[in-house]
A protein has these predicted regions:
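Flexible, glycine/threonine- and acidic-rich loop/arm segments that mediate assembly and lattice contacts
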Residues: 1-246, 254-330
Length: 330
């Protein structure tokens, strides 16, 4: 298992280290996630990581003299996560780079490409579905559907106004306690969209549960009872007319609740990071994160640069992550 910080230590090139830090700065998820880096590409160019997910735990019993235990077995099921290649390329004219001075165009484009890669990884961690997109792995929304850690799947909690927050914040706290009790450990984050994070801060302030810590770069991070909030932010979508709209990575949707359409519903995710719960996957060696800078010493007016990350996620136990469904925020 390796973290991005540990992966950075093994890189001797300063630019490589800087690009890795850009990923860590832009994504607290990537910064704190541990990755199994033992995956070796198979034949045929596959990057499949197979693992077992525990679905039914073992039970212990007491028995009377001259009686037998009732047989019961823990059960697990094989799953596969295909490591995906995230990244992108950009092109820069050598004149633009030469005249950009201290505000390097290469540095600017690299930083923006890292941010876009982090956004896509966040989106895939939540919304990924390998059945509908072969370039994706299965995200938490799909993995937790129908599991014991999918909480409030058929109910609804109203936080759509300040008055509703005043009335219902204790109910939300009870549901959070219920969710946390289903996990195999303490979650690393409370993952939600921006609007839901703001609602959670309101609840934490009302309850006296607002806490504050620092990330790896000394930046302040708010949390709920010591669990940091992780804003999964937005993902830009290109429309038919060429314009871009940004939509929350954890969506705000209209859903059917008790045979009635309810708008403004969203979810909160609680991942427990660890070898036997929820972790990342990458390949063995130095290909985890790579950058390829434009080489303006070569012929050609326009040179290309690229940023690339090889990653997937694995949920080793159904209690390694949880989702609290159907919170109305609009």
């Amino acid at each position: 298992m390796i973290t991005l910080e540990q992966f950075k230590v093994g890189r001797s090139d300063y630019i490589d280290q800087h690009v890795i830090d850009l990923f860590r700065q832009d994504s607290m998820l990537l910064d704190r996630l541990v990755f199994d880096d033992a995956m070796i590409p198979g034949t045929g160019g596959t990057l499949a990581y197979k693992y077992m997910r525990e679905e039914v735990p073992a039970e212990a019993q007491t028995r009377a003299i001259n009686t037998e235990y009732t047989p019961q077995e823990a059960s697990r099921k094989e799953y596969s996560a295909d490591v995906k290649i995230f990244g992108g390329s950009y092109q820069i004219d050598r004149v633009i780079e030469r005249e950009s001075g201290i505000a390097s165009e290469v540095a600017y484009q690299t930083e923006k490409k890292v941010k876009a890669t982090c956004n896509l990884f966040h989106k895939t961690v939540i919304q990924g579905d390998s059945d509908t997109d072969t370039n994706s792995f299965d995200g938490l929304d799909k993995a937790l559907r129908g599991s014991v850690t999918e909480i409030n799947a058929n109910g609804m909690i109203d936080l759509s106004s300040a008055a509703a927050v005043d009335e219902n914040y204790k109910i939300v706290m009870d549901w959070i306690d219920e969710t946390l009790s289903e996990l195999c450990g303490r979650p690393a984050f409370i993952m939600a969209n921006t609007s839901m994070i703001n609602k959670m801060k309101s609840i934490a302030r009302r309850a006296g549960y607002m806490t504050r810590s620092e990330d790896s770069f000394g930046r302040s991070v708010d949390g709920y009872d010591g669990i940091p909030f992780l804003d999964m932010k937005y993902y830009p979508t290109k429309e038919a007319d060429g314009s871009y709209t940004e939509k929350p990575i954890i969506p705000i949707q209209t859903r059917a609740i008790n045979n009635k359409e309810v708008a403004g519903l969203t979810d909160i995710y609680f991942p427990v990071i660890g070898r036997d719960s929820f972790h990342g996957v990458t390949v063995k060696g130095d290909s985890f994160i790579k950058q390829y800078l434009p080489d303006f010493t070569k012929p050609g007016a326009v040179q290309k640069g690229e940023v690339e990350m090889l990653a997937a996620i694995a949920l080793k136990s159904t209690r390694g992550a949880a989702v609290l469904r159907n919170i109305k925020i609009r």
